[in-house]
């Protein structure tokens, strides 16, 4: 046993020594460089090594990084300690950074009403345009601008607390590009713009991608700077075996890794201390294993303590740059400047951002305001700087507008009411007028239907719109038998004023056409012309699994304006209010208040309030009510209160319980209003998939003999 331990220690010592140059001689007062390789999530190992360097007080004179090495190295060069970078890594949702989802809460009012598509394909000059990557990198800008705000006035990277450079690849020439000056955030984004994951980054007249395509392990650039001792953190792994090369992604990664391996071997001769953490089983996308990867880097770094302790020590503990008076936590913006703007002018930008000038702002506020601008879907990417003149400072936006005007979109959905539907959509921007949006949905499936929406968005100045829809559906009884079959067509003209993309107020005139029949007999036709007013709001953070925000849809209308007797006209008022309250990070309480009243007599049956079923489509005066079949209950006046307790786990999984109760009455009276006629309990299991919601619901009505009902929902509602 004793001999075995000695053998293991000897082998370990040999392996460590093999990572240190045999002829390494540490000169007097050597300059120390740090070479940080690229590798996506594997780059978290850099942070563990930095923690070791910090614990030993090692003085680093220059840092070179590629891709994730550029991000970590840039933070360290800007004065962050290893522990501080560790906290940043652990607190950051890297999947969200890659997928780059637009904030629903900041989306325009029109976009919130059409967020139901799985795929959107731009059309330019009549041709389909494929996306250049999964992400534009917009969320990376927000994060990096916030992290590097303390050095945002430094455009010469040699002036950072630790001199720094990062490597990118010129996409046009294929040549390596070393960034040592310019916009630090933009340079780091260029170095880490992995093809297909992140859009190429435009700097000057060139576009750049991940530096790993040319030099993934930048040790030679440090030697070229006169660095004596280069400490490298090597993330290189063996190429995949034949049995693992069984799909297109694995094959493409292998092709890329071949060149990375070849260049990394060349860089070894410029690396004096080569620290290679154990990353077996890890990949560039192993973000769920970030703690393990970081710890492996720390463990590997500790093995080199003896040689590292021989290096010079720094004279101070903190490298963080003192607070800049202009780029501090709160700073003043006197004016706005745009670069790259061809379609949307300064007034449009200021209005959508909600930016008043002059004003005091924080980086967080600027990020949120730019996010509002991005959420309009009129921009592909927005970068920014705060530039100080002698007497004032201004916010400069570098915008890349989305000049596509026409789109084909697709969706897929299933529910127990409208069954299976394939959604085909044509959308257009700036059609006939500058601030217009057109959306035409055609649903092919068990219940064909269409929706047409055209609106001129003038912000708070009233804009004109038209809306048209058509569908058919079956009404059920307590035994789930069809008791009526309706066809419904609606055409509307309206005006609408939108306030801060959160509230819409307006009014219009709608024409409804109904055809109803049962077993091809007793066919009824009716037409109604109804003037109406409305107020709407939607600040929910998620359409399918909201945990915060509110939803309001209130409407008042006169039913059948052309009815000859004015005093017998019927007025209806209804409101749908949903309040989502986050209780903890996992739990949320959702309250839905729905009410509708009818003033007048002889209400046409088509305008009765009808409850039952699990659905979210806009259908006359129908409202979902778990535990009952679609439109099973009908009345002239209704109060419905629904309570949900939602639990979120494993990021995209949800479990919720529901208790709902309703009052239905044909007359308006206090005595009728306080009675609870119907109630139900329900439970829902849900998953937020890349293709939309997946939900399974079981609901059971109380106080009657009706059986429980299972419901399945797949995909976004339409």
Q: Language-model features: where?
A:
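Patatin-like phospholipase
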Residues: 19-66, 74-371, 375-387, 393, ...
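C-terminal hydrophobic structural anchor segments
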Residues: 646-678
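Outer-membrane beta-barrel and related beta-rich outer-membrane complex signature
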Residues: 245, 476-478, 517-521, 566, ...
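C-terminal outer-membrane beta-barrel translocator/porin domains of Gram-negative envelope proteins
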Residues: 410-412, 531-650
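Bacterial Sec-dependent N-terminal signal peptides
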Residues: 1-25
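Gram-negative/organellar outer-membrane beta-barrel architecture
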Residues: 364, 369, 383-544, 614-623, ...
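Short glycine-rich beta-strand segments
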Residues: 469-473, 510-514, 555-561, 596-598, ...
